A protein has these predicted regions:
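Residue(s) in the substrate-gating loop at a strand-loop-helix junction
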Residues: 125
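C-terminal helical subdomain
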Residues: 163, 167, 180-220
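Substrate-binding pocket helix/loop in short-chain dehydrogenase/reductase
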Residues: 81-82, 89-92
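Active-site loop-to-helix junction immediately N-terminal to the catalytic Tyr of the SDR YXXXK motif
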Residues: 131-139, 151
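Conserved NAD(P)H cofactor-binding loop of Rossmann-fold oxidoreductase domains
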Residues: 73-79
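Active-site helix of classical SDR
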Residues: 105, 141
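N-terminal Rossmann NAD(P)H-binding glycine-rich loop of SDR-like oxidoreductase domains
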Residues: 9-17
Length: 243
């Protein structure tokens, strides 16, 4: 088997790569990323394909057509008041966080329209499901991605296919380097394993720490979205000021 991890040079994508490298059934693991694959984790199974998702060109996919699993983990976001956001930032955010995943999934979609297993997991974000002030652009990109996945999974179901796209929507994750720190795969290894497990079961939604944290958070949001948003605003503002 062969897998492709988009965004596999860092964060949760790197953890997924390392997990798959440990599985005998995977003979090759393609990594698409703007950043080089870390030399520290060099492995003969890894095929690194440089690609900048912000430019709208996906020629690199042609070198990874023979895959059986697809994990899309690339994405970025920054705490910003909307008045501080530039037009280029908005464009790049949607290009990387939303348009690229849709285009990549479309490239491999014929594999999903099959009786054979094709595994697909996509990192979204809990920010796409809640009011997220100071993360307005990021949450918008992820909300669009979430709704796309929901709709396509319905299409697959009604058309009689077993394959699904797993939406993974976590909150803040330690060890991913999302906020600028280094990637620490050992901190996200358990999560990576669970993402792979659920993807291979063709599940549709996984919210890590749902019972412990996000069940209550979502309930608060649904009870009074504006009140929740105001509380989120002040919480994020304190985080921004602490940097």
């Amino acid at each position: 088997m062969r897998a492709l991890i988009v965004g596999g040079s860092s964060g949760i994508g790197l953890s997924i790569v390392l997990n798959l490298l440990g599985k005998e059934k995977y003979e090759s693991v393609y990594v698409i990323d703007k950043a080089p694959f870390p030399e520290k984790y060099a492995n003969d199974k890894v095929v690194y394909l440089p690609c900048d998702l912000s430019n709208g060109k996906y020629d690199c996919l042609e070198r990874a057509n023979d895959i059986h699993a697809l994990y899309i983990t690339a994405g970025f976001g920054h705490l910003k008041f909307f008045q501080e956001v530039s037009g280029d930032y908005i464009q790049n955010s949607f290009s990387v966080n939303t348009v690229a995943p849709l285009q990549i999934i479309r490239h491999y979609y014929d594999r999903m329209l099959s009786a054979e297993d094709f595994y697909c997991g996509v990192m979204v974000s809990i920010a796409g499901r809640l009011a997220s002030p100071l993360f307005s652009v990021y949450s918008a990109t992820k909300a669009a991605l979430s709704k796309f996945i929901e709709a396509v999974n319905v299409e697959l179901d009604v058309q009689g296919y077993k394959n699904r796209i797993l939406e993974v929507s976590p909150g803040s994750l330690k060890g991913t380097g999302f906020s600028g720190g280094p990637s620490q795969p050992e901190l996200t290894a358990t999560l990576a394993d669970e993402i792979i497990r659920r993807t291979e079961l063709h599940e549709e939604l996984y919210i890590p720490q749902y019972e412990d944290i996000f069940k209550g958070v979502i309930a608060r949001y649904e009870a009074d979205a504006h009140k929740y948003g105001v509380e989120s605003y002040w919480y994020k503002k304190k985080r921004l000021e602490a940097k």
